Amino acid sequence: MVVIPLQNIMDDIERLKSEAGIAACDFIRDGMKLGLGTGSTVRYTVIEIGRRISEEGLSVVGVPTSEATRELAEKVGIPLISLAESGGLDLVIDGADEFDNNFSLIKGGGGALTREKIVAQSSKSMVVVADSRKQVDILGEFDLPVEILPFEW
């Protein structure tokens, strides 16, 4: 029997998430208006965008889908605008809670579902970043996020 320390497995998962998040940046072009998604993998995308702005002179603006993403984007130096100011987005990069073989998705388990949907609908294109642990045969294997908006209660 071979025992692999849990820390080694976690390090591998984080490395793969980092690689996936950084690879998503290959779709970004100078001058784009970006939707900045929410989640542990997209976090690496946001950090890489900040690095490219600082080190390579990339010129983009972002619209965050959550307060956590807003805080991180500000920290790494991504200029932010509101969705209303954007006039529409070129690309949104976001994560997924699970996806099936047809690439149908369930999103929003991180608590930013409404904002994620609004930003996605405002974008011309979307890149979804997810690792293989999120792939399922049938959607619904994990918890299903449900929106409840306190409108007219």
Task: Locate predicted features.
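Short active-site oxyanion
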Residues: 31-34, 55-62, 104
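Active-site catalytic pocket residues across diverse enzymes, especially alpha/beta-hydrolases
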Residues: 49-53
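Glycine-rich beta-strand-to-loop/alpha-helix junction loops that act as flexible
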Residues: 35-41
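Short, amphipathic alpha-helical "lid/cap" segments that border enzyme active or binding sites
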Residues: 17-25
